[in-house]
Amino acid sequence: MRTLNIGILAHVDAGKTSLTERLLFDHGAVDRLGSVDAGDTRTVDGGIERRRGITIRSAVAAFTVGDTRVNLIDTPGHSDFVAEVERALEVLDGAVLLLSAVEGVQARTRVLMRALRRLRLPTIVFVNKIDRAGARTDGLLGDVRRLLTPHVAPLTEVADAGTPRARVTRRPPDGRTAEALAEVDTEVLAALVDGPEPTGEDVARALAARTADGSFHPLYHGSALGGQGVAELVEGLLGLIPAATPGTSGGTSGGTEPRGTVFAVRPGPAGERTAYLRLYGGEVHPRRRLTFLRRESDGRTTEVSGRVTRLDVVGGDATLTAGNIAALTVPGGLRVGDRLGGPTDRAPQFAPPTLQTLVRARHPEQAAPLRSALLALADQDPLLHARPAASGATALLLYGEVQMEVLAATLAEDFGIEAEFTPGRVRFLERPAGTDEAAEEMPWLDRTRYFATIGLRVEPGPRGSGGAFGYETELGALPRAFHQAVEETVHDTLRTGLTGAAVTDYRVTLIRSGFSSPLSTAADFRGLTPLVLRRALARAGTVLHEPYQAFEAEVPADTLAAVTALLASLGADFTGTTGGDPAWIVTGELPARRVREAELRLPGLTHGEAVWSSRPCEDRPLKAGNSGPGTGVGGHSGE
């Protein structure tokens, strides 16, 4: 049986969960339609999700059509849960991008489409809610071509749009489809220019090929609630998006080592962690011993090994084969992002979170349970980067205020803990400015000091590398426990740099070492390492960087001058201005700490008509005269 892993992506309230419920019901996977409003949907499994009517964690459900099993992954629509979307993108064979026929193309939709196009992930556009008052079809197609992708063609037509009588009919690939395909398919272009004109079969083959390579996007219409157009959408999924098979997933079931990625973690009924694994090659069966690679927040790669004690393959198979998804349990627990058989080739499409907050228990007796709960939540979302901070608090990284509210509710409902969050602050980072070193010799006569010899060199590492530790001394020159003490302390110490911000993209090398067998302990090395490291770091110097966000603002033509003046005053660097009457699109990059102000002031300048979207991009050195950590703008100092 073939397997098709499909992600459903959209702006909040475009109908993702409703479409999932419709697909499951129409193909016999559930015996009744769930409702987001009623709180009885299949894929929305948390109390917070049910009350808010939004998806927070990617959920998996499956149905079967003929010889194809379709695994549906219902992803979050809110921008504060962008990390969940990124993990889902890694495991997909294709995607359905939903639009509301009433609200049309929204800011979040454009961000998602950019990510899908960068990945060249096969994507079908589905215009939902055609039976709602105010629904548009022809005008919306123009917006899709202008704002999402010019390479799109409708394969359905709608009659009586905007009324309960709305209905959908198929529109076979024709000359208009061929003209749209000609922009991305040279054979179709040659046939249109030189003849003979392509037949319907020729156009259909080209449509399938260009959809499969992610360069073209078929568009369907329908209503998830009413069911109109859903059969046509399924027909498009099966016919236009290549399904995973053992051959296309990177291995067969006959002896190749398994390769896959953990994209979600959920707590089990007995407190165990259940991991969701997409397998790209090989096979996994119960009791098999697996070794996962884990990238720690400080840049190190560690191994997690264990036997599979529980394996539930989506669809009910006994063995997990290439292309499929399963929930499994391994003693010791897995984290989101753990890789089986090495990393995948796909790079992250979204930057890490840039807001930092401190979390404390409202009641002192809950301080220890709060730390344990936050560590458990960090296993589900490693980008939280939970770590100890000053005064018994825990520091977290977040994307926005909604994520903070959800975390507070999760702690209260799932763990019984009342937590208090400080207002989110932009997280600054330090990077080494140069290379330098420091050393401290073992004091043979002074027993009040550390019985250890340590020399360290600090230098810049490649951008995006995090942190690395190496040796120029012989590994046998120190006991293993002393080596481990130095390495762990280096990474712990650099969580706070010279200005109070965390240090990143560094390489620290142990260049000198020594110990006294009867006197030295690992504690001596843990105590001396921070002193030597901070001396070397101060000599090398650091450069403070602040996060930036790439923005896109669509504004009425008569407000362009006022908008650009505002953005310039907030420190924006412009990368482009396109369009004309009636609207202009302004793009650029803006310090993350000024984004909220831009969002609040734009509506007043544009009669409420501005469409704004932004996403984290590469950070930059902090400009002279701007405030950094510890000043009320940057991260928390002294952590």
Curated annotation (Swiss-Prot):
Name of this protein: Tetracycline resistance protein TetM
Xref: SUPFAM superfamilies: EF-G C-terminal domain-like, P-loop containing nucleoside triphosphate hydrolases, Ribosomal protein S5 domain 2-like, Translation proteins
Similarity section: Belongs to the TRAFAC class translation factor GTPase superfamily. Classic translation factor GTPase family. TetM/TetO subfamily.
GO BP term (any one): response to antibiotic
Signal peptide positions on this chain: none
Record GO cellular component, one term: cytoplasm
Keywords noted in UniProt: Antibiotic resistance, GTP-binding, Nucleotide-binding, Protein biosynthesis
InterPro entries named in the record: EFG_III/V (IPR035647), EFG_V-like (IPR000640), P-loop_NTPase (IPR027417), Ribosomal_Su5_D2-typ_SF (IPR020568), Ribsml_uS5_D2-typ_fold_subgr (IPR014721), Small_GTP-bd (IPR005225), T_Tr_GTP-bd_dom (IPR000795), Tet_C (IPR035650)
Role description: Abolishes the inhibitory effect of tetracyclin on protein synthesis by a non-covalent modification of the ribosomes.
Listed Pfam families: EFG_C, EFG_IV, GTP_EFTU
Residues annotated as domain tr-type G: 1-247
Region Disordered: start-end pairs: 247-267, 611-639
Endoplasmic reticulum keyword on record: no
Species of origin: Streptomyces lividans
UniProt feature, compositional bias: Gly residues: 627-639
Binding site for GTP: 10-17, 74-78, 128-131
Single annotated GO MF: GTPase activity
